[in-house]
């Protein structure tokens, strides 16, 4: 960041030497008062933006770490997929066994009638 030459206080306390046929001191003071207000406003805005920048950079670092952790986790993903497939196969076999027995019983009962 560029170094500032003046602070609002420096501008406020600046004394000009009066010269013959120079500028009206009241006009100069009025103008400098407005410059001071603008300068203070810019300083506050700059500080707020710096704080926001720091907060956002910290958030980016945090999210980058989360992505890095997520990138290492997929190695455990196939294990859970295999486990899910195993569960689905077992469930299918169980359904075939239970519902197949019921179908056999229903067919036997229909032949008896």
Swiss-Prot record:
Gene3D superfamilies reported for this sequence: 6.10.250.660
Known role: Divisome component that associates with the complex late in its assembly, after the Z-ring is formed, and is dependent on DivIC and PBP2B for its recruitment to the divisome. Together with EzrA, is a key component of the system that regulates PBP1 localization during cell cycle progression. Its main role could be the removal of PBP1 from the cell pole after pole maturation is completed. Also contributes to the recruitment of PBP1 to the division complex. Not essential for septum formation.
Classification via HAMAP family: GpsB
Keyword terms: Cell cycle, Cell division, Cell shape, Coiled coil, Cytoplasm
InterPro entries: Cell_cycle_GpsB, DivIVA_domain, DivIVA_fam
Quaternary structure, from the entry: Forms polymers through the coiled coil domains. Interacts with PBP1, MreC and EzrA.
Coiled coil region boundaries: 32-71
Full protein name: Cell cycle protein GpsB
Recorded family membership: Belongs to the GpsB family.
Species of the source: Lactiplantibacillus plantarum (strain ATCC BAA-793 / NCIMB 8826 / WCFS1) (Lactobacillus plantarum)
Domain of life: Bacteria
One of the record's GO cellular component terms: cytoplasm
Signal peptide segment: none
GO BP terms in the entry: cell division; regulation of cell shape
Cell compartment(s), UniProt: Cytoplasm
């Amino acid at each position: 960041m560029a170094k500032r030459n003046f602070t609002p206080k420096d501008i406020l306390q600046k004394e000009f030497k009066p010269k013959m046929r120079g500028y009206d001191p009241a006009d100069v003071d009025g103008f400098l008062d407005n410059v001071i207000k603008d300068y203070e406003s810019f300083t506050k805005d700059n500080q707020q933006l710096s704080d926001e920048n720091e907060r956002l950079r910290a958030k980016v670092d945090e999210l980058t770490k989360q992505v890095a952790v997520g990138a290492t986790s997929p190695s455990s993903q196939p294990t859970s997929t295999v486990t899910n497939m195993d569960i689905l196969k077992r469930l299918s076999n169980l359904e075939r066994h239970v519902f197949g027995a019921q179908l056999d019983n229903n067919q036997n009962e229909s032949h008896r009638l």
